[in-house]
């Protein structure tokens, strides 16, 4: 039986809409079900259904490196993988999709 990936999108700081969009594109490309979007790391840690947290880049977890490593380690211990979605492949996919939309004359 194929494992279903269920994720929470975690956004923090400025440009939340951009962070969310990049994560949704990543989820779409990798067949990941997004349960909800939050800016509360405790909600992520307490989610019993999810096995992933999608973030634009992992530094969004915490600006302080010690807190970052402790948080990621704690999430991993609970079976929640932290996934950075601002990969070159994901950005290229988004750009190419937008170019195709523009060629067809669609508006964003």
Label for each model-derived stretch:
Residues 1-108:
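Short, structured surface patches at the beginning of a domain
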């Amino acid at each position: 039986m194929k494992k279903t990936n269920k994720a929470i999108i975690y956004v923090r700081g400025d440009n939340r809409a951009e962070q969310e969009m990049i994560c949704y594109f990543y989820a779409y490309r990798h067949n990941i079900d997004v349960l909800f979007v939050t800016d509360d790391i405790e909600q992520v840690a307490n989610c019993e259904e999810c096995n992933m947290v999608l973030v634009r880049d992992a530094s969004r977890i915490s600006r302080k490196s010690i807190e970052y490593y402790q948080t990621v380690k704690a999430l991993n211990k609970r079976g929640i993988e932290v996934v950075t979605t601002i990969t070159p492949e994901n950005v290229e996919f988004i750009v190419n999709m937008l170019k195709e939309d523009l060629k067809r004359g669609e508006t964003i």
